[in-house]
Amino acid sequence: MVTKLLFKRYELPPLPYNMDALEPYISKEIVDVHYNGHHKGYVNGANALLERVEKIIRGELGAGQYDIQGILRGLTFNINGHKLHDLYWRSMAPAGKGGGKPGGLLADLIEKQYGSFDRFKAVFTEAANSLPGTGWTALYYDTETATYRS
């Protein structure tokens, strides 16, 4: 019997470049660990938890056979890990094929908020360096304050 999926499954997207394309800045081995290890692990982890949720909904798991708070924490962790790695891959480019200062509206907004791109880089780097252990720093637009935040 084929069971209908209640939730769309996450997929590991292809890298937008070859694994060695970021050398000498990021080695092929590090890209491989992050892509085939971490990123793939987040996708598989999210999908395994979605399968568990489907079993709960279908009544295949009884009370006491699952921890809904743990499942929600796991989904949050794995889905965020997947989405952040997807952003990570798309935010980088091989040498000579990207990077540098942004242009257009983003450049204008950074200039307005930070005074200069160099000042933005300093603030962003400070935010990244202040994280305990390992973690992510991302630039995002806060619609409530109409400012960029990291």
Describe each region flagged by the PLM:
Residues 1-150:
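Feature for soluble, non-membrane regions of globular proteins
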